[in-house]
């Protein structure tokens, strides 16, 4: 018997086929015990896998004829902690178990059948349950001097008991060193935390292999100890194993192999092996050798020793797979990010109240919270069904005759809820768009399962499969990304407009039935589900993930989401103006993902163009399988025969020295093989750092045009400074900017109340500037920042190489008290090309365009302010998220 994923199911779910099973309380009691245990194990693995993978359905063929669920019960042995996640149903000769996702509010991040981590509790070798295992693992991550395993697992005995254990340990050590024992000798040594007695069974090798992993795991994970095979655990009498039944060489090899195969997980860097010593103690009877006691001394282990791989499962790549030890441990140890160094961020979805695969969601403290965004995008009213978004459904109704009547007819049975329209829910979920889909609409209403309507212009054989896949993907995203913990199924319904087949279910009524508990959708459930939907639609992997060391999601701003929602077939060309820190590059990356799915593109069909290598490398790292990133120079030097769509970022800093880049980009996209492609250009004239012609069309010809005016990057003092510099830039624009280019149509919105630091220091000589930077870097590193938080930027590229060695010399000069501080800074300085690595960036303002760091030093070596100086200053200052130091040398 094995588990397989039913890929031909009519459910929009992950369905695990468990094969044949005997059901019924009495019937299972009467069956062969081994078969009963095996069937139960198969079902539990399927349950565990679905709990950890977003939920789904277990389908089993009922083996015993005449079975009736209502009369006979089930008879499966399911752990109590799992039962509240399950609903059961019989359908003819199949038994269905509906599994909802694991909820981390249970106190552990994922479902586990058995941790296979053991510990000693007085005289017992016990397996740790999931919560005990989690506490143990957290304890093991502490420094060795702070580790007290016993304290982490329960209250300790009084001091007298500790003394008693110490005496036993001494006696056990003496017993371990004895060369011979007497048959039936009664040992003056009871079992304890440090001592375990095990009798040999008939099959010596099997006995050792069965008991030894648990004993070694328990002693290694507690305080070390001794296990004596061949001593009666109740009478403490020496029995041993008869010499005729034991081969010492073979048994030693078996024990060595068994211990070496035990899974271990290291939190330390030394990574030692399990330390143990094996002795065979002779057992004599009336002066003659009768047999042997096998004694094993196990040392306390630095980290974690498992008896075998944890019994925890997941669905991955259409297979039910057991989690490897390393992956299980890492998953168990996942925790919310430490935002103490990110005061501008607020946690909105915590790992402690979500689902196993969800990630923490953080938003800027000045942004609308998750609940407010849900009410903005997806409001819930008690007296009507709300259609949203208004602009989209009105456009669809005006373009497609009969669509309004069709939708209104479908909504008649519902008195309350929200109907969310989309040009393609498939694209919204990261799937490829299907031709012939007019629109999709998701209905969430009280006391009903959510329904996904797909409106086709005509029926074909692929309609059913498409709607099933989209419904399944939506459910998985709501649970695994959105963190929804309730019971959830998405019912797909296909409608064909202007056809005799007005609306038709994609599967028969037999398979539409879900347990009644899945229909229990209260207003509170609706709001929770819609908040998960906000995360699904607006969530993206934050660049903070690299800084925090774990994946974190941010949410798009309102304007970013509005632009992302545009119909790309109708908005082939767009100029997007955005202030520094408004998220232009993030939006550019998301737009390329959408292009891929709307137009069924390969990475070779989508080109991302920017001016500088560092930004190109960042995009290449972030979106390896989405696009082909190049610089403007590379774009102008080469032909791109397969390119159909182009995204241009930081366009205000492009030049025409290598030719008309805008004309070339427009020609490529307008003459693409499959029709006109997408050309979106992101720019900000305020961040122009050169005096050459940019090659952009005049602002009056940049149509259609959109603006992103909400700035969320910078701390309050830096944001205030940027506003001052922007005003100066308007009054003193560089000569190469066309009239009106620094006029924003909408008033900028700046982050307020975010703590940070701004220092402007003038009239220093260059040597004083370099010493200041070196000392400040050391101070920041001592106070919790890392090299990857810091960028030192010069106003000109030529200055970087000119003064680099002098800055390094300043870094080398340390007082005696500093000799044992941070690791060698000389090995932690590099340019902006590898901005994601853990080093201090030393580069020019121009090459750092489009990037950011928590701490930025801007160095002006003391030249007369050139034309466009304020724009260059804006480029510099806007790179800093929390601390900005502007150091000006005297002219």
UniProtKB/Swiss-Prot annotation:
Family stated for the protein in its record: Belongs to the Schlafen family. Subgroup III subfamily.
Record location of the Glycyl lysine isopeptide (Lys-Gly) (interchain with G-Cter in SUMO2) cross-link: 59
InterPro entries xrefs: P-loop_NTPase, Poxin-SLFN/SLFN_N, Schlafen, Schlafen_AlbA_2_dom, Schlafen_AlbA_2_dom_sf, SLFN_GTPase-like
SUPFAM superfamilies: P-loop containing nucleoside triphosphate hydrolases
Gene name linked to the record: SLFN5
GO MF annotation terms: ATP binding
Physiological role: May have a role in hematopoietic cell differentiation.
Pfam families listed in its UniProt record: B3R, SLFN_AlbA_2, SLFN_GTPase-like
Keywords recorded for this protein, A-Z: ATP-binding, Differentiation, Isopeptide bond, Nucleotide-binding, Ubl conjugation
Disulfide linkage: none
One GO term describing the cellular component: nucleus
Keyword hit for Endoplasmic reticulum: no
Gene Ontology biological process terms from the UniProt entry: cell differentiation
Name the record gives this protein: Schlafen family member 5
Chain positions recorded as ATP binding sites: 578-585
PANTHER family registered for this protein in UniProt: SCHLAFEN (PTHR12155), SCHLAFEN FAMILY MEMBER 5 (PTHR12155:SF26)
Key word ATP-binding present: yes
């Amino acid at each position: 018997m094995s588990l397989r994923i039913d890929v031909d199911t009519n459910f929009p779910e992950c369905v695990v086929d468990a094969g044949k099973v005997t059901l019924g309380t009495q019937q299972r009691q009467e069956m062969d015990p081994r078969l009963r245990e095996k069937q139960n194990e198969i079902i539990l693995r399927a349950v565990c896998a679905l709990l950890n993978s977003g939920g789904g359905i277990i389908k089993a063929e009922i083996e015993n004829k005449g079975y009736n669920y209502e009369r006979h019960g089930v008879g499966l042995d399911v752990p109590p902690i799992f039962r509240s996640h399950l609903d059961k149903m019989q359908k003819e000769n199949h038994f269905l178990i509906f599994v909802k996702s694991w909820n981390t509010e249970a106190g552990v991040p994922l479902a586990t059948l058995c941790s296979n981590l053991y510990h000693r509790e007085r005289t017992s070798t016990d397996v740790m349950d999931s919560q005990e295992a989690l506490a143990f693992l957290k304890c093991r991550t502490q420094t060795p001097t702070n580790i007290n395993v016993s304290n982490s697992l329960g209250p300790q005995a009084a001091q007298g008991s500790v003394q008693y254990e110490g005496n036993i340990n001494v006696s056990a050590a003496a017993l371990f060193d004895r060369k011979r024992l007497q048959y039936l000798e009664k040992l003056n040594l009871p079992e304890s935390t440090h001592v375990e007695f095990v009798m040999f069974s008939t099959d010596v090798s099997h006995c050792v292999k069965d008991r030894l992993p648990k004993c070694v795991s328990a002693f290694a994970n507690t305080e070390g100890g001794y296990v004596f095979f061949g001593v009666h655990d109740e009478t403490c009498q020496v029995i041993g194993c008869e010499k005729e039944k034991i081969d010492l060489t073979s048994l030693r090899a078996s024990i060595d192999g068994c211990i070496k195969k035990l899974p271990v997980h290291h939190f330390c860097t030394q990574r030692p092996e399990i330390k143990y010593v094996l002795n065979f103690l002779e057992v004599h009877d009336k002066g003659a050798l009768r047999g042997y006691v096998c004694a094993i001394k196990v040392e306390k282990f630095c980290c974690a020793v498992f008896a075998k791989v944890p019994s925890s499962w997941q669905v991955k790549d259409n297979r039910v797979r057991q989690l490897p030890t390393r992956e299980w441990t890492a998953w168990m140890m996942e925790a919310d990010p430490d935002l103490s160094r990110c005061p501008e961020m607020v946690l909105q979805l915590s790992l402690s109240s979500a689902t196993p695969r969800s990630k923490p969601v953080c938003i800027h403290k000045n942004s609308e919270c998750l609940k407010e965004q849900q009410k903005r995008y997806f409001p819930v009213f008690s007296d009507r069904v709300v259609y949203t978004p208004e602009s989209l459904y009105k456009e669809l109704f005006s373009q497609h005759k009969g669509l309004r009547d069709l939708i209104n007819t479908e909504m008649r049975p519902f008195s309350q809820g929200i109907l969310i329209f989309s040009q393609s829910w498939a694209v919204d979920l990261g799937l490829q768009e299907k031709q012939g889909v007019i629109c999709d609409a998701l209905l969430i209403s009280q006391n009903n399962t959510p329904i996904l309507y797909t409106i086709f212009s005509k029926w074909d054989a692929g309609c059913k499969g498409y709607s099933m896949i989209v419904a399944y993907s939506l459910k998985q995203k709501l649970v695994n990304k959105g963190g929804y913990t309730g019971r959830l199924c998405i019912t797909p319904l296909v409608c064909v407009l202007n056809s005799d087949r007005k609306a038709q279910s994609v599967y028969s009524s037999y398979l539409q039935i879900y347990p009644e508990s899945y229909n229990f959708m209260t207003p509170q459930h609706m709001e929770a589900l819609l908040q998960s939907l906000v995360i699904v639609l607006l969530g993206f992997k934050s660049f903070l993930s690299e800084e925090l060391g774990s994946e974190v999601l941010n949410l798009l701003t309102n304007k970013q989401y509005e632009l992302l929602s545009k119909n790309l077939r109708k908005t082939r060309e767009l100029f997007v103006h955005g202030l520094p820190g408004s998220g232009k590059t993030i939006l550019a990356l998301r737009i390329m993902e959408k292009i891929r799915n709307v137009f069924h593109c390969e990475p070779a069909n989508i080109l991302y163009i920017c001016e500088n290598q560092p930004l190109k490398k960042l995009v290449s790292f972030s979106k390896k399988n989405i696009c082909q990133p190049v610089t403007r120079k590379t774009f102008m030097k080469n032909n791109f025969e397969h390119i159909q769509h182009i995204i241009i970022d930081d366009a205000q800093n492009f030049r025409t020295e290598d030719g008309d880049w805008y004309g070339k980009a427009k020609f490529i996209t307008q003459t693409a093989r499959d029709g006109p492609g997408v050309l979106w250009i992101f720019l900000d004239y305020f961040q122009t750092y050169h005096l050459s012609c940019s090659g952009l069309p005049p602002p009056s010809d940049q149509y259609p045009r959109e603006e992103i005016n909400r700035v969320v990057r910078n701390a309050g003092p830096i944001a205030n400074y940027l506003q001052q510099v922007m005003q100066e830039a308007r009054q003193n624009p560089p000569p190469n900017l066309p009239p009106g280019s620094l006029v924003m149509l909408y008033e900028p919105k700046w982050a307020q109340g975010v703590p940070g630091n701004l220092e402007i220091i003038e009239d220093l000589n260059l040597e004083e500037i370099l010493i200041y930077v070196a000392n400040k870097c050391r101070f920041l590193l001592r106070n919790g920042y890392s090299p990857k938080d810091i960028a030192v930027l010069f106003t000109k590229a030529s200055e970087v190489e000119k003064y680099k060695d002098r800055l390094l010399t300043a870094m080398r000069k340390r007082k005696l008290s500093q000799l044992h501080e941070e690791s060698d800074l000389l090995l932690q300085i590099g340019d902006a090309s590898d901005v994601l690595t853990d080093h201090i960036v030393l580069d020019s303002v121009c090459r750092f365009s489009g990037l950011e760091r928590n701490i930025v030093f801007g160095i002006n070596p003391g030249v007369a302010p050139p034309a466009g100086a304020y724009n260059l200053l804006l480029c510099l200052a806007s790179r800093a998220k929390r601390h900005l130091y502007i150091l000006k040398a005297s002219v």
